[in-house]
């Protein structure tokens, strides 16, 4: 393999690393949230501070907890929907910004890792080419099977 081959190999590995991370982050970025998840979380946070709600929850016990929570949340949402809708819009903007920041950060990390990986490949390959050794892949040996005479 020549130095040109080493450069092509390093460039290919770098490109594969960066494209893989971009595709993975693009999929993660495009996934939306379930509708109303943050509204329920906000309602639960507001309900946790209410002594009446805490008392009703402790009286109910664990058996009817899910149904009681659902009823309390729906009741709370029906009474305080305007503030929660505004908070939901703010939450959505913050979440979108955070996803974008994570995407950019991971893209920079992928570029950095791709650079160092290509540098290691180029350095190792160039040393081998310079020393005059052949750079060739190792021969592929099939694993022994039941029909193999070596078993």
UniProtKB/Swiss-Prot annotation:
Coiled-coil regions, chain positions: none
UniProtKB keywords: Membrane, Transmembrane, Transmembrane helix
Keyword Aminoacyl-tRNA synthetase annotated: no
Chain ranges passing through the membrane: 7-23, 107-123
Membrane topology: Multi-pass membrane protein
GO cellular component, one term: membrane
Cellular compartment(s): Membrane
Recorded superkingdom: Viruses
Name of this protein: Putative membrane protein ORF10
Native source organism of the sequence: Ictalurid herpesvirus 1 (strain Auburn) (IcHV-1)
Taxonomic lineage of the native organism: Viruses, Duplodnaviria, Heunggongvirae, Peploviricota, Herviviricetes
